Amino acid sequence: MSRNQSREARPNREVAQTVSERVYVETQGCQMNDYDAERLVDVLVSQAGARRVDRPEEADLLLLNTCSVREKAQEKVFSQLGRWRRYKQDNPTVLIGVGGCVASQEGAEILRRAPFVDLVFGPQTLHRLPQMLARRRSGASAQVDVDFPEIEKFDHLPQPRAEGPTAYVSVMEGCSKYCSFCVVPYTRGDEISRPVADVLAEVRSLAEQGVREVNLLGQNVNAYAGALDDGERADLGLLIEAVARIPGIDRIRFTTSHPAEFHSGLIDAYRDVPELADFLHLPVQSGSDLILKLMKRGHDIAAYEALIDQIRAVRPGLVLATDLIVGFPGETEAEFEETLAMVDRVGFDGGAFSFVYSPRPGTPAAELHDGVPEADKRAWLQRLQARLHEQQSAAARALLGTRQSVLIDGPSRRDPRELSGRTSGNRVVNFPGDPSWIGRFAEVEITDARTHSLRGRVVSVEGQAMHAAVGAGG
């Protein structure tokens, strides 16, 4: 019996008194927040008899899962809370909770600015929400719990419920790199890895529910060092090999990585594990060694480019994506040109998340003199994004006429009457098809290429006899 199962089996008398809640969850930010939101719902369903609703006006409990990475994150949170306040005014039994990284950063300060909030919890304490909710429903004052209790939360979460053929699995929490611009170590704590057995148990549970693809999550996921049963530690490469052996799991992704800890075992996984997708998101942030040093990234641009060469040597079809920041304190036109030159040399055919630098409270970079004119920052961002757009568009056009293996994950967002899926290289493909195909792999011929999505016709579907290609170009 796993630790999760043994904890699950214990009745929680405090939570047993809680009325059934209709819960609405709104999530901001990264994939880790998406994962946390789903697990938050799982624990409320399991321990508090909750059910999820799709509209805030239907809810007894409104939860905002927040992100603090980008500019004005706090103001966005309080703006949303202000909009939700009317639900509480209309019905005083409605409770409002704030979780995620802004909650971790602000703590009880949220109650000072928004005294109508009932619950404040951090990423590491979301499993305690049923108890906090029960106390608040019983008449206690507003509840605040934003501690960093290491890996405790995973011991209290029920096994996840699959909602389609793809799923996120958190394998570690926190980050210990302390890049000068980044707030994550202060809101999610230092790196803590889940034991290998716990991760594999979660993946097996998902596979038994029909999941075909898992995305292993961590703020610095390639620093993973999970405990094995013999007390030794497994790196991310070994974990990927173990996940690939689980029946039913046919594709594996991971995110997000740091170049300074991309070890040889992970490169070997790209060589030896065919289930590992032809995709890598590896943030570089800048093409200037001076700026990388100010950012405290722990590597120079030559090391980044050498690493990419090593990975591409063992996985020639790799699609590469990254993160880039412009306008960091101390950056000049010369440093920005170095970033453009690096983009040209490396080639980010998978695109990039690119932003103008914004200081985050409490980080070392926030203390640096920011003498970069705002007009320069905006102009640099436009030039950078234009260059990245060219690369991504060219890579998409190069796929015209090729056949791609696509995991069909649901209706198309562009046209719900059609289907959609992703290639191994993480490219979205839309095509006509039968909803019964969802959860299967299909061979799709690419007939039209746009920067952010492809269109194709189905040539074959796993386990399906095909008499003719399905779909049309255009």
Curated annotation (Swiss-Prot):
Coiled coil: none annotated. Its main location: cytoplasm. It is found in: Cytoplasm. Its cofactor is [4Fe-4S] cluster. It is an enzyme of class 2 (transferase). It catalyses: N(6)-dimethylallyladenosine(37) in tRNA + (sulfur carrier)-SH + AH2 + 2 S-adenosyl-L-methionine = 2-methylsulfanyl-N(6)-dimethylallyladenosine(37) in tRNA + (sulfur carrier)-H + 5'-deoxyadenosine + L-methionine + A + S-adenosyl-L-homocysteine + 2 H(+). Residues 397-460 form the TRAM domain. Binds 2 [4Fe-4S] clusters. One cluster is coordinated with 3 cysteines and an exchangeable S-adenosyl-L-methionine. One of its GO terms (molecular function) is metal ion binding. It comes from the Bacteria. Residues 21-138 form the MTTase N-terminal domain. Its EC number is 2.8.4.3. Keywords: 4Fe-4S, Cytoplasm, Iron, Iron-sulfur, Metal-binding, S-adenosyl-L-methionine, Transferase, tRNA processing. SUPFAM superfamilies: Radical SAM enzymes. One of its GO terms (cellular component) is cytosol. InterPro entries: Elp3/MiaA/NifB-like_rSAM (IPR006638), Methylthiotransferase (IPR005839), Methylthiotransferase_CS (IPR020612), Methylthiotransferase_N (IPR013848), Methylthiotransferase_N_sf (IPR038135), MiaB_methiolase (IPR006463), rSAM (IPR007197), rSAM_horseshoe (IPR023404). Residues 161-395 form the Radical SAM core domain. [4Fe-4S] cluster 1 binds at residues 30, 67, 101. [4Fe-4S] cluster 2 binds at residues 175, 179, 182. Catalyzes the methylthiolation of N6-(dimethylallyl)adenosine (i(6)A), leading to the formation of 2-methylthio-N6-(dimethylallyl)adenosine (ms(2)i(6)A) at position 37 in tRNAs that read codons beginning with uridine. Monomer. Belongs to the methylthiotransferase family. MiaB subfamily. This is tRNA-2-methylthio-N(6)-dimethylallyladenosine synthase. It comes from Halorhodospira halophila (strain DSM 244 / SL1). The lineage of its organism: Bacteria, Pseudomonadati, Pseudomonadota, Gammaproteobacteria, Chromatiales.
